[in-house]
């Protein structure tokens, strides 16, 4: 069974220690709820990942664990077969002992767009909300973060993350907890909070922004990346049914509207640092994710529109700073 005890030990003498009052019970309940289904099967695969400590790791320019020179061809083939049991791999890519996990998303492209604009992560405590399998968490560690905590309720993402962590050979200060942000108390403790690709999945975007604010220390930095549309501060797309075949997309604001929401939630120094239309080469079907991807979500006759006729995915990155809260919003 996946254990969170090392995380509890690491935060026992940190500014996250009061989280221990509720966190073990919440994670214990999550484990009980998932003791049937796929999680036990994936945990058995994790228990087979017994490999030597890697001869090289790189989290600065990629997520690379081992060169592959330590493994025989047979060992490498066995490892690849084990890692394929965690398919589909959506966020990456990862390079594990010479095995290239070519994920659906080129998450490294997003990191290259976002990272030049954020405050340096050196010695920062970081929260990544909706972290997926943890690709960006490793890049945050590579950028010098003191501790990185990711939250995502998916059992598969947790097991993909655990596979990379176990193969990395060290107990790195990077932890994925299978939680949604609504399960976090107001911690007021993180120096930087990332929410990338989450806001449009929330039924109440304002509540999500307030939840993000509650995790930041005063003066902490929010890095928010989400779908946007063109328009003024009153422009918000509410898809009638599906958006890009997704039935869980609720609100897609303009950049101006999103900045207004952040201001209303008592963020300051709000600035848009990047906008980018998602390219077909950034999100695509691969050997490690053989299901439908972006090209199937767009109008085959006009890729500037989704298959439903809405504007094709365009993403913006907004950076803001936590200010003294307005009591009317809390």
Swiss-Prot record:
Q: Which organism is it from?
A: Shewanella sp. (strain MR-7)
EC number(s) for this protein? 2.5.1.-
NCBIfam families given in the database record: PRK15068.1, tRNA 5-methoxyuridine(34)/uridine 5-oxyacetic acid(34) synthase CmoB
Please write the reaction equations for the catalytic activity of this protein: carboxy-S-adenosyl-L-methionine + 5-hydroxyuridine(34) in tRNA = 5-carboxymethoxyuridine(34) in tRNA + S-adenosyl-L-homocysteine + H(+)
Subunit description: Homotetramer.
Domain of life, per lineage: Bacteria
Q: Which Gene3D superfamilies match?
A: Vaccinia Virus protein VP39 (3.40.50.150)
What's the family?
Belongs to the class I-like SAM-binding methyltransferase superfamily. CmoB family.
Q: Which SUPFAM superfamilies match?
A: S-adenosyl-L-methionine-dependent methyltransferases
The record's keywords, sorted A to Z, are:
Transferase, tRNA processing
* Protein name from the UniProt record: tRNA U34 carboxymethyltransferase
Q: Could you tell me the gene encoding this protein?
A: cmoB
Give the protein's function.
Catalyzes carboxymethyl transfer from carboxy-S-adenosyl-L-methionine (Cx-SAM) to 5-hydroxyuridine (ho5U) to form 5-carboxymethoxyuridine (cmo5U) at position 34 in tRNAs.
Q: Which GO terms describe its biological process?
A: tRNA wobble uridine modification
**Higher taxonomy:** Bacteria, Pseudomonadati, Pseudomonadota, Gammaproteobacteria, Alteromonadales
The EC category is: transferase
- Write down the InterPro entries for this protein, in alphabetical order: CmoB, Mo5U34_MeTrfas-like, SAM-dependent_MTases_sf
Residues engaged in binding carboxy-S-adenosyl-L-methionine? 91, 105, 110, 130, 152-154, 181-182, 196, 200, 315
